[in-house]
């Protein structure tokens, strides 16, 4: 699959989607994106910067949601202009899609909305690549129906069907907890869409702090290594210069100063894994 200026897939080195959870300020966004660009250039990692202009599903109605759609998109456009990076952001409603698609390179659908057929169809008709997150309530094989919805809508609109990614972000395991079943990464390959693993939301503890979500960022390296060992097309990770001060999802964000070491380890593992054949089909 072609994503911007690079090809993605299981036969390619992993690509990275990374950035802050939400756009907090222009300066922090540019600084964070610039540092990630430096790291990824050194490690030869294809990189897409991500950040949200709005967090529509916060635990509390009083939580910070962002700087607003217009300002958030303006700042993301500055990332593109100043740093030459492709950008991704999530959309939350059909009426937002046209404006967002005019700015960003990749759309993302929130996990909670993966079963909303009209919404998936509208994203698919945007003409943009779409990273479709698997809901925390969904079995991995159910993603085939979701990807098929997107492809059907694209085909009916006369657009490429080869623009959709399936993203694993953990599954609900009791109250306020998520677990990652690494089998899901292999199962989701059956969609014939590139599979992305979200290593930071997978360690989230949804609503775990009452009015906000908790998280266990110490397990991000563990799950990221496991996903790369299984074999993925891409990784998604949120990071922040100071997670303790982050306005959204700080407990599961990787400290920015730790990203280089983590990614270096993951690149080494990815190279080793993808030199060998994937044997799942031989065991049937």
UniProtKB/Swiss-Prot annotation:
Membrane-spanning intervals of the chain: none
Keywords: Cytoplasm, Lipopolysaccharide biosynthesis, Transferase
Subcellular location: Cytoplasm
Any GO molecular function: 3-deoxy-8-phosphooctulonate synthase activity
Protein name from the UniProt record: 2-dehydro-3-deoxyphosphooctonate aldolase
Pathway: Carbohydrate biosynthesis; 3-deoxy-D-manno-octulosonate biosynthesis; 3-deoxy-D-manno-octulosonate from D-ribulose 5-phosphate: step 2/3; Bacterial outer membrane biogenesis; lipopolysaccharide biosynthesis
Cited Pfam families: DAHP_synth_1
Gene name linked to the record: kdsA
UniProt entry tagged with the keyword Kinase: no
InterPro entries: Aldolase_TIM, DAHP1/KDSA, KDO8P_synthase
The species this protein was found in: Paraburkholderia xenovorans (strain LB400)
């Amino acid at each position: 699959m072609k994503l911007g200026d690079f090809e993605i897939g299981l036969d390619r080195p992993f690509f990275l989607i990374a950035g802050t959870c939400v756009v907090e300020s222009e300066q922090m966004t540019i600084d964070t994106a610039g540092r990630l660009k430096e790291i990824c250039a050194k490690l030869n990692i294809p990189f897409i910067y991500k950040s949200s202009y709005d967090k529509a599903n916060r635990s509390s109605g009083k939580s910070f949601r962002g700087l607003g759609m217009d300002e958030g998109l303006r700042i993301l456009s500055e990332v593109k202009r100043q740093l030459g990076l492709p950008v991704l952001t999530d959309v939350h409603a059909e009426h937002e899609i046209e404006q967002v698609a005019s700015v960003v390179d990749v759309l993302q659908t929130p996990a909670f909305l993966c079963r909303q057929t009209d919404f998936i169809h509208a994203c698919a008709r945007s003409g943009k690549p779409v990273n479709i997150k698997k809901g925390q309530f969904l079995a991995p094989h159910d993603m085939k129906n979701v990807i098929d919805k997107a492809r059907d809508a694209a085909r009916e609109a006369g657009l490429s069907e080869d623009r959709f990614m399936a993203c694993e972000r953990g599954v609900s395991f009791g109250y306020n907890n998520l677990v990652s079943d690494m089998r899901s990464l292999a199962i989701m390959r059956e969609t014939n869409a590139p599979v992305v693993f979200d290593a930071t939301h997978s360690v989230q503890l949804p609503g775990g702090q009452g009015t906000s979500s908790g998280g266990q960022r110490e397990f991000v390296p563990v799950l990221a290594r496991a996903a790369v060992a299984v074999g993925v097309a891409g990784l998604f990770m949120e990071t922040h210069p100071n997670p303790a001060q982050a306005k959204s999802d700080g407990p599961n964000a990787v400290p920015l100063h730790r990203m280089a070491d983590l990614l270096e380890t993951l690149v080494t593992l990815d190279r080793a894994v993808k030199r060998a054949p994937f044997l799942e089909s031989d065991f049937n």
